[in-house]
């Protein structure tokens, strides 16, 4: 079905095509025809962060920034859906055009800039959702006009608002499209921010009588020293999990493409190698008590298995869906199932 729709969608610019695809998914959900678009995978229960996921394949943040499509997306067969990135105040993001396809590479470049309607709107949307069939992550960020020195207040505000509704919360400090945001990954800044948010998390757990896991999403462009420093901080502060990785600012593998010079984060197939290297190094540096979600470059079941082999407990797709459609979800679940049932049991490979 998606193979028939893709030429139509690709006739539009990438951001417009995303909106049309979401509208189609919503229509299928409302009319009970989602089965024509995607086949729900056989459950593959997977534990992580103290939660039980129906299957280990999720949707990465960015597609549903305001939580407007949660039920329709879960109906496609995802084990979990991550919405956002959401900020305290609404913001328009960067000027359009700000999303570009590189079909020859199964890649996307975006410089969206945390465009969203604000956390209060997202909360209302989540409250309306039925949330059947999977878990919900909420990805939080800071407004672009909030200086890094005051970033903690933005993250804290968002965490307080979404805490009662989220199955897990992701702290996004790694988007390349908000000026200066990645500076929060530097060791001392990271330690200050995460220490404060861990205190907030524990206070909210006491207030609400439940503990919602807090994850941190990191960039693929960290060098080995930066990865080791980040791992040290995240282990010291006992975060619940890490998502590896966000998009990359490097263009080495797509340098010949006419869109390669567009500013923004590159995602899709060219990101697979670098994001998986970061994932593998983090797995070697972090205690087993901190699970990892592998994201970046998954366009096949084999790619999902590569993430699991590098140490991921769960995986997420996004750009791969642009090129493969919803069938990618079931393909990834089935590939991970075969790996799990293999005699080796899926041990992590060497660094």
From Swiss-Prot:
- Specify the protein name: Dihydroorotate dehydrogenase (quinone)
Gene3D superfamilies (UniProt xref)? Aldolase class I (3.20.20.70)
Gene that specifies this protein: pyrD
Key words of the record: Cell membrane, Flavoprotein, FMN, Membrane, Oxidoreductase, Pyrimidine biosynthesis
SUPFAM superfamilies named in the record:
FMN-linked oxidoreductases
Location (main, coarse) = membrane
Give the residues the record marks as binding FMN.
61-65, 85, 139, 172, 217, 245, 268, 297, 318-319
The membrane topology of this protein is: Peripheral membrane protein
Localisation per UniProt entry: Cell membrane
Q: Which GO terms describe its biological process?
A: 'de novo' pyrimidine nucleobase biosynthetic process; 'de novo' UMP biosynthetic process; pyrimidine ribonucleotide biosynthetic process
Q: In which pathway does it act?
A: Pyrimidine metabolism; UMP biosynthesis via de novo pathway; orotate from (S)-dihydroorotate (quinone route): step 1/1
Q: Report the PROSITE patterns cross-referenced here.
A: DHODEHASE_1, DHODEHASE_2
Q: Which reaction does it catalyse?
A: (S)-dihydroorotate + a quinone = orotate + a quinol
**Could you confirm whether the keyword Chaperone appears in this record?**
no
